[in-house]
């Protein structure tokens, strides 16, 4: 029966079991554009059943603009346009009903007119294979088209699908279009009186050229009911454009699959989420050209808790951004010592914005073509090392499983990667062989100028076989080791700050980063695993540092594995032990392989098998290194050891780095004549996309890594190993660049009362009562290298703004550039930092005299003390830190050293950023009956007693060492190592005056 219904007063969603057929609201018989009401998306009732004579309203998208790939569990078709047209349905037996007559009312200008046709055939089969989506409470049917449809003509913003909870918005302008089939809906009525039967074969339609992935995605549509095919076929025969071949880089939009309800009812009508509203949406590479209105452009970011899962957001809420721009200060000059630090350009992440959850975004340039799928872009050739050829640079490694599956992936971040400035990481490994550090390491760290002097944002340095003898370990426990001091001195002028360090005997790992990246490096943790002597000795094993950089979990693992040719299986077991034992706390990645990116490097001690010494040297001399690759144990193990699955390494285009004669570039000429081998290696692994969501709730395939150089440095000859360095470029699909704390300070302090700091904290920040704000000089070396500090108060001053003031006594005198930083006890790093500002305060006589005395004492130090104790480090303890220099980022300087028994009852409650520098109340030694002091109890100039003196047998008793406590004596109290010579003989720490004099002149004194 054909005809037009004039009743449309009832709203959709009410049952149409009796009376006239209800018309969807907004569908009229005038020429005005029709409007599809959002109530079409109401969820279906689970137990509703249609009457035997109840007609069903079928909606089928027609035209190339409505073509979408069907998911594996059932299609969810978005309404392509609010322009419905009439199309009859066919019965399952293949009998077609009469096609609706085309009249003047169905002209393209009269968009809202409908022609309703009823069919007395049997009802279509249930949606068991995803062919029909029919809410039983509405009687709506949206069958998929039988057979593949034409590809989309364009992918503009008007095709942005909407989520279930959002209403559809009509397009900005609806004008006449050449055909109705291009953007219309096919509506038909089907009675449901007969049991379902298999549908008939649909009419043949020209099929576009599809990729294998798209054909598999469209396979369920081939079993759709014939009722949908007639409506679209009749429309296509009239005015559908001819299909064109579909390029490999273009694909249908893939809405996520949705299963049926628990009672077996078909799923409700569900469209793809709106990219402007859904947090799970990611930019797609289908669009060939970007426009300011294109939904694939990046959006402002929003920091989410680490345990937030994916899901559609509520209306009005912010969506997490894909990317926000980050600044990169000007590159330092090519000089070894760069000029003074200029103020870095203002960054959206460091400047106040209108909303704390948003920062402005920079869309891609209009003339920048988006990359096609299946192509990989190599990094800039300028970053290649001198001894590598451009054609040998490795291709970028992405987290996607393969490039062929990217076309069907529901998310791709390639357009975002294209606009990401990148984050450069340099990794260095060096077995120093207990040697003293060289004078200069700028070439090793790529800091001596050139194209890549400004390329590093983070530097990881792994050392092995650092001198760990007992006397060296005692000095290193009190002061920073020489190697750490060397790298801090070299990197400090280039704005690098020590983020974290960990040491296990001779294995050390140092992690540096530019100071302006510190607010975006969080959750810093370290761990170590011993594997020497069955796990009881730390000469072999691994140390690691993990952190979150811009919301991405990174882990750096420095290992020293067993040596010798026949210990390959033992090296494998040790590596497995390290991976299994090292665990981290917190909601982030717990195991090493759970991180988004893992760097594994160190002296892995893999050797070259089969070939003898003469052939190996011949291959090296004749530059035939490829013959040695095949017999390298690590290369062979990559194919056989499951533990190495996913680890990648750049080409070994440099000569083996072991073993050399110390001081030369000649391989071992000793009696052992060790065979050269690539023992020092750098590998990386990106978390597989199938590893589940990341700790932040986003998908794991969101990181791209490119290795720009992988080389050895033959110019360093202090060890029998050559150092190896690699440079990487990381491109993030999104950046969490919202600082947790924002500091506000005046541009210049010329009076002490101007030393006021105001700061604001985000609601997600977990603050601690041990947080503090430090004042640093420009070029500071680590987070505890401050000039002054003040505890962070948490009393609300103005809304969410807090304020602290530095005391006049703690402020530095004179003129200089300084930086303020908020140190988080929970994150173990500066999470808020300011731009450089100036302090110009008049110097006082007290400050000048203190400086003169400090300089005099420094001149009295011997050469060994100056070599061990570098003078540029600041004390991590706030007490008296402005007057004295410390030698370690973990311990304070010792103007006077007191050894006394440790007592829990006598521990003071002094709060300090460094727990090692807590000071105890001074207790004078017992006095004899005649009032004279015994031993070293002579009082100093200020009346305070001197340090204790123990009998000669005390230093020889090692059992007493754990009960001793190292403590800082008040420098103003005159506590010195030199008591009266007369009282030294019976109770001196050393059995002879010469021994005491040596201790006074040694490395522990000022």
From Swiss-Prot:
Chain span(s) of sequence motif RSXSXX motif 5: 911-916
| Entry-linked InterPro entries | Endo/exonu/phosph_ase_sf, IP5, IPPc, SKICH
For bias type Pro residues, the affected ranges are 196-209, 337-347
Tree of life domain: Eukaryota
Identify the EC number(s).
3.1.3.36, 3.1.3.56
Listed name of the protein: Phosphatidylinositol 4,5-bisphosphate 5-phosphatase A
Omega-N-methylarginine-modified residues are where?
Answer: 56, 65, 83
- Skewed-composition ranges (Polar residues): 27-41, 94-112, 256-273
Gene3D superfamilies in the record, alphabetically?
2.60.40.2840, Endonuclease/exonuclease/phosphatase
- Give the compositionally biased regions (Low complexity): 180-193, 210-234, 348-360, 398-409, 844-858, 927-946
Which species?
Homo sapiens (Human)
Function summary = Inositol 5-phosphatase, which converts inositol 1,4,5-trisphosphate to inositol 1,4-bisphosphate. Also converts phosphatidylinositol 4,5-bisphosphate to phosphatidylinositol 4-phosphate and inositol 1,3,4,5-tetrakisphosphate to inositol 1,3,4-trisphosphate in vitro. May be involved in modulation of the function of inositol and phosphatidylinositol polyphosphate-binding proteins that are present at membranes ruffles.
